[in-house]
């Protein structure tokens, strides 16, 4: 199993996902500022993994605070939370994990040392819970995949695998469960421009576990569906509104439109912590814009002439009506049933 975030020897170990697939490297994180930078630069990425990393980042920040006075400690911890919140605006798991850590701090009665101890325990609990959640999501997804053919060919976008979570994955968790039960023929992976998470990360995960994988460019999906090569689409999500609108990596929306046009089921797999019940619909989801260098430069090569302007949103929002079902640890639900079926599980 692949574990992108590990607590070991009083520090956090992160798989450096910016170096995959050509180099497997592990980065040690000792301070909250280092964690914020790792999240911002996508050394660690994927909404659930970011949440786990942020939880540990909160503990690292708490560990750095040198005071025994409770109120002063909590004020400084709020500044750590502010630092981490500013890293990635779209992934709601980040904010959820930070809020849970703050709740632990404020509700702990006792010394500052006891608060710090409880914060570490909470971060470790978030880590363990996410791993278990992903395994359940995988099995819940397997249960609602099309029954025919016996062996399915699935298509995914970006990387919603073990690297994007505490382990196992959400969308790739469904793929893993299907592979384990003999129900997967092959996975098609979109390359996912501009950062190529599908090409670099999803294919890498599949190769590690012997899962048959075929890489395609993003603009090949419609052709593959027309040729009858795809039985279902399974993607992850970074934030889901109460009505079922789902924000995921840029290109997911167009993939959902194409799937609808070809009568291919389109599933979103995500933990309940990704659902933001405070947002009525997807128009309220903040969309991160990243450095345009991701578009116009590959390595040291610039692809465009001078004078070109760029627009680089990292995410788009897929309307609920294009989604067949949202797969959570509580089961799989039609988007219209999301609130009544899942809200009680939100911490």
From Swiss-Prot:
Stretches of the chain forming a coiled coil according to its record: none
Record-annotated active site: 238 (proton donor)
Molecular-function annotations in GO: S-methyl-5-thioribose-1-phosphate isomerase activity
Alphabetized UniProt keyword annotations: Amino-acid biosynthesis, Isomerase, Methionine biosynthesis
Residues under site feature: Transition state stabilizer: 158
Originating organism: Trichormus variabilis (strain ATCC 29413 / PCC 7937) (Anabaena variabilis)
Role played: Catalyzes the interconversion of methylthioribose-1-phosphate (MTR-1-P) into methylthioribulose-1-phosphate (MTRu-1-P).
Functional pathway: Amino-acid biosynthesis; L-methionine biosynthesis via salvage pathway; L-methionine from S-methyl-5-thio-alpha-D-ribose 1-phosphate: step 1/6
Name of the protein in question: Methylthioribose-1-phosphate isomerase
InterPro entries per record: IF-2B-related, IF-M1Pi, IF_2B-like_C, Initiation_fac_2B_a/b/d, M1Pi_N, NagB/RpiA_transferase-like
Family per record: Belongs to the eIF-2B alpha/beta/delta subunits family. MtnA subfamily.
Name of the gene: mtnA
Superkingdom of the source species: Bacteria
One of the GO biological process terms: L-methionine salvage from methylthioadenosine
Positions that bind substrate: 45-47, 88, 197, 248-249
